[in-house]
């Protein structure tokens, strides 16, 4: 028997033995256990399904009335929201919104914010596809000063580039960003639009 034939035979026996070791008997699952597992799967998956539904409406489906634009492009609404605005649950009437989806599959994105008046509240709420609010940039967390924040997906392992204030990691490669800018009254709407 040649050396190659012997090696192939030994390898075949080893693979067969490993496969036999991994064989498991079927696990008996009661209907109650199956239902409990299904409930857990639903609770786990529902936020991602709803997040993707919003992603699709905002970035892909141009016929959808909630369409905002392509990935990585900010869409702002310097106006007062009413009960007719249903894309976001309970929109605020005193913090006009900007919304956008980031696609981090190819590379991180940089969010640069200008210096804000000290008395004006603003923030960027960053939400991953699991609907976890994983970071905020703005008055309550980073202050009202200017800054540049690198938003990176789960696979990015680079060093913080020069000029970047902070690196923010997301669990998912798609991130929903909601910006709120304080409106001091109807006469302030032009200033909010300028900020946005």
Question: Where are the predicted features?
Answer:
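C-terminal motif of bacterial Sec signal peptides marking the signal peptidase cleavage site
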Residues: 17-20
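Bacterial N-terminal signal peptides that target proteins for export
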Residues: 1-10
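A compositional/structural signature for long, glycine/proline-rich flexible linkers
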Residues: 22-196
């Amino acid at each position: 028997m040649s050396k190659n034939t012997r090696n192939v035979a030994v390898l075949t026996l080893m693979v067969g033995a490993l496969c036999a070791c991994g064989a498991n008997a079927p696990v008996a699952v009661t209907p109650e256990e199956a239902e409990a597992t299904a409930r857990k799967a639903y609770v786990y998956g529902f936020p991602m399904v709803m997040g993707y539904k919003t992603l699709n409406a905002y970035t892909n489906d141009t016929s959808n009335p909630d369409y905002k634009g392509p990935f990585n492009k900010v869409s702002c609404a310097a106006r007062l929201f009413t009960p007719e605005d249903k894309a976001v649950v309970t929109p605020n009437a005193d913090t006009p919104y900007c919304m956008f989806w980031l696609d981090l599959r190819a590379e991180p994105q940089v969010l640069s914010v200008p210096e804000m008046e000290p008395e004006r509240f603003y923030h960027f709420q960053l939400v991953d596809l699991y609907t976890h609010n994983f970071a905020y940039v703005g008055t309550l967390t980073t202050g009202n000063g200017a800054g540049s924040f690198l938003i990176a997906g789960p696979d990015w392992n680079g060093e913080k580039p020069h000029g970047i204030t902070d690196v923010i990691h997301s669990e998912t490669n798609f991130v929903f960003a909601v910006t709120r800018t304080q409106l001091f009254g109807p006469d302030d709407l032009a200033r909010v639009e300028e900020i946005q």
